[in-house]
Amino acid sequence: RIPFEKIYRSFTRDQYEQSRLERLRARFRYWTANFDLAFGFTDATTDTTNLSTALELRRNKKRLDFFFGGYYWFRSTKESGESRVTDENRLLGRARLNLDLSDRTFAFSQLTAEYDEIQNLSLRADQAAGIGYRFVDREKLMISGRSGPGYVYQRYFGGENDNYFTILFGGNLEAELPYGSKFRWGAEYLPEVSDWQDTYLIRTFADWALPINGWLDFKIAAINIYNSQPEEDTENNSFTTTAGLSFRF
């Protein structure tokens, strides 16, 4: 007999034999993936173009939980008789590996990298490793926190660097809601060890997905990044929201 908790997907023999997609899902049963796409265009006195894409991969097998996400945002505007202006051009990637040490405790290692033209950020890369704990671990609700030492590397256009050692404090929430919808929230606080009151970075992610059919969701997502020491002539805060479609694999 196969324990119920080890059953990740079920389908009939005919479904398996007639569908290449089902065979792939069986072979990669520990993996989930989604591709998100949002697009907007306005043709008026002020023309606007918006594009947002994301690719997320996750492999969750007992003891090991791996996540990778790649995200891109672009927005431009054009006034009548003027040249087109880029308002947002940002690329972000993040990866994290959790290793269960007990039912609730886990070790983690993570890496985040970001490019932001509007914030004059050529590259920000930060990595951290440490210990985490699941405060709530139910079938439809998971709340966890984690902390550990790390390093933040920041290079701005023009060659200026701003690097520091940090201790990461992070948290995540995942919840299954009515109608099959899902909500995710995550936050990270990365202060400089030697100047934690004045130099720090705060990142917050959130998204809500509502199923349309077996492979397509409607998704609303938001990201907020606050840098207490931004480059000259740029704002501390960078906030973006998107609404579009999410294709599940």
Regions found by a protein language model. Give the residues of each.
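Transmembrane beta-strands of outer-membrane beta-barrel pores
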Residues: 39-43, 61, 72-76, 113-117, ...
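Compositionally biased alpha-helical segments
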Residues: 1-42, 47-48, 52-56
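Residues that define the transmembrane beta-barrel architecture of outer-membrane proteins
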Residues: 47-51, 87-91, 123-127, 141, ...
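Residues on the lipid-exposed face of transmembrane beta-strands in outer-membrane beta-barrel proteins
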Residues: 35-39, 53-59, 95-99, 129-133, ...
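Repeated loop/turn-to-beta-strand initiation elements of outer-membrane beta-barrel proteins
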Residues: 62-68, 103-107, 138-143, 177-183, ...
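Detector for outer-membrane/organellar transmembrane beta-barrel domains
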Residues: 140-191
